[in-house]
């Protein structure tokens, strides 16, 4: 098998492989690569494929960026997805391919002065959803284990079951809001999104954070993600009001979805029914649009390693009846002294 840089391969063949691969999800695609380039500085796309007789045998997305003045292999702080290999490789061929892949990852990372790489096995890939990945494959590649879990809702269940599996308080919030018609939720996709609507979410997001969070390139990149059919924007307002109180972004691929970001206007942050209603209406929309799984959020350990805000968000996302799936992660350092500064 031979290594072919992404620049010599092109997007069409790469994405066609991802579309067919059980081991690829959106984060493997060129759509997400383009999006990722808006989330860092001094971006270099180091992605490559393995080729054999003119056939793609694996795709390896990898990007090096400057974050906080430090060079890292990352996508805007998101870990790099584990390589996606062709399904028909024999066990021996898989080992050979992975040996070649991880050697090349290390070479490229060092060549571009990356201090570290963080990688994960995407929970929305078919092998994880089907419970075929039982151990962290990164450990045998010299990565330090940083695995956690994630919550993934099975949308093939009927609505009554989805509601019943939620924490009782969230369920009561949703039922009460539906009965009184308290809120109106709108969902915007590639066909209905407009710049004006998206700008309203960006303003809402900045108000929630208390500062401008997104750069202009990232704002445009996020809008482009929706326009490419890889995202949804969900916005909530009180019935009879014109302004939005909350919203969130969902990433889409292969009839599976991931909750990317959320924001609530600070004045309504303690209205606990808002988040519950917004998630429920998102789940209903996805279910009726034929989506099978919705990864609602990573479940972080309740330790001081994470901020109070991060732990609170993680706890909130655990309340919606999702199946707990492994989130196999790992990190590897190429320059320990610089990495410790991060």
Task: Go through each PLM region and give its residues.
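Aromatic (often tryptophan-rich) hydrophobic motifs at membrane interfaces
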Residues: 49, 99-103, 224, 230-338
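A gly/proline- and charged-residue-enriched helix-loop-helix capping module
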Residues: 76-128
């Amino acid at each position: 098998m031979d290594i072919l840089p992404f620049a010599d391969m092109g997007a069409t063949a790469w994405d066609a492989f991802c579309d067919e691969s059980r081991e690829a999800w959106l984060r493997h695609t060129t759509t997400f690569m383009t999006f990722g380039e808006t989330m860092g500085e001094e971006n270099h796309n180091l992605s490559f494929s393995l080729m054999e007789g003119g056939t793609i045998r694996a795709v390896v997305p990898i990007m090096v960026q400057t974050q906080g003045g430090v060079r890292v292999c990352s996508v805007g702080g998101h870990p790099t997805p584990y390589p996606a290999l062709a399904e028909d490789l024999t066990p021996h061929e898989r080992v050979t391919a992975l040996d070649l892949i991880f050697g090349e990852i290390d070479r490229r990372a060092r060549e571009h002065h990356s201090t570290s790489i963080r990688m994960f096995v995407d929970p929305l890939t078919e092998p994880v959803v089907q419970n075929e990945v039982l151990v962290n494959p990164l450990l045998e590649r010299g990565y330090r284990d940083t695995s956690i879990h994630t919550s993934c809702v099975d949308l093939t269940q009927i609505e009554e079951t989805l509601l019943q599996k939620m924490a009782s308080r969230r369920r009561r919030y949703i039922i009460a809001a539906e009965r009184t018609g308290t809120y109106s939720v709108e969902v915007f996709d590639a066909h209905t999104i407009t710049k004006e609507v998206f700008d309203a979410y960006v303003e809402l997001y900045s108000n929630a954070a208390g500062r401008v969070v997104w750069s202009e390139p990232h704002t445009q990149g996020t809008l482009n993600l929706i326009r490419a059919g890889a995202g949804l924007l969900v916005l909530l307002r009180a019935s009879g009001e014109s302004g939005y109180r909350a919203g969130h972004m969902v990433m889409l691929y292969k009839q599976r979805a991931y909750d990317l970001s959320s924001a609530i206007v600070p004045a309504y942050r303690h209205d606990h029914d808002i988040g519950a209603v917004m998630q429920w209406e998102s789940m209903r929309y996805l279910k009726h649009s034929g989506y099978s799984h919705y990864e609602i959020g990573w479940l972080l350990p309740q330790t001081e390693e994470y901020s109070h805000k991060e732990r609170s968000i993680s706890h909130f996302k655990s309340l919606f009846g999702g199946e707990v799936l492994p989130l196999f992660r790992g990190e590897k350092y190429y320059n320990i002294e610089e990495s410790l500064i991060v």
